């Protein structure tokens, strides 16, 4: 995933499950904002930002996302993405600078655009096996729940 601002961009590795969870939480947040009238009607009805462009090159990962937090501040959705180690613990690279962290301040229409693209990308993948939930190749796959029989 890439986060862009004023000509700069950062690329982070993010798990497919994290993308799904982030999109679901964003959609839930928008519903809560609408229900609680916490955002202006103009912000809530603004069309989603459409971004179908490919990722910027070169694609060099800054870090792998571990912890993600979402907050609502001053009509902005603030997303913090922090690096994590293989043990799912926070990384602290340097005492002075702290862990790798990206903070993205997004408008509601940008969040809607993220949800649209996330759903498009996630649903474009291979279908899941109904028995084991692993991805199924066009020629099938060896299903561990079916004792290795091809499905």
PLM region spans:
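Short cysteine/histidine-rich zinc-coordinating motifs and their immediately flanking basic loops
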Residues: 140-147
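The feature marks the first
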Residues: 1-32, 36
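Mixed-charge, glycine-accented linear interaction segment located at domain edges/termini
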Residues: 12, 86-140
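A cross-family "folded-core" feature that marks the main globular domain of proteins
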Residues: 1-4, 13, 37-38, 52-54, ...
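Short, structured motif recognition centered on aromatic/hydrophobic residues
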Residues: 1-3, 22, 26, 77-81, ...
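Intrinsic, low-complexity N-terminal interaction/targeting segments
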Residues: 40-101, 105
């Amino acid at each position: 995933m890439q986060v862009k601002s004023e000509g700069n961009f950062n690329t982070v590795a993010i798990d497919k499950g994290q993308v799904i969870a982030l999109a679901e939480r964003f959609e839930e947040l928008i519903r809560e904002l609408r229900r609680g009238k916490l955002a202006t009607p103009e912000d809530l009805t603004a069309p989603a930002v459409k971004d179908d462009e490919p990722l910027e090159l070169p694609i060099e990962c800054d870090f792998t996302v571990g912890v993600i937090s979402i907050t609502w501040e001053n009509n902005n959705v603030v997303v913090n993405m922090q690096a994590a180690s293989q043990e799912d613990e926070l990384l602290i690279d340097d005492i002075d600078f702290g862990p790798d962290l990206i903070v993205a301040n997004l408008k509601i229409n940008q969040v809607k655009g993220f949800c649209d693209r996330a759903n498009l990308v996630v649903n474009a993948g291979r279908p899941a096996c109904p028995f084991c939930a692993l991805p199924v190749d066009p020629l099938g796959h060896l299903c561990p729940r079916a004792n290795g029989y091809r499905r």
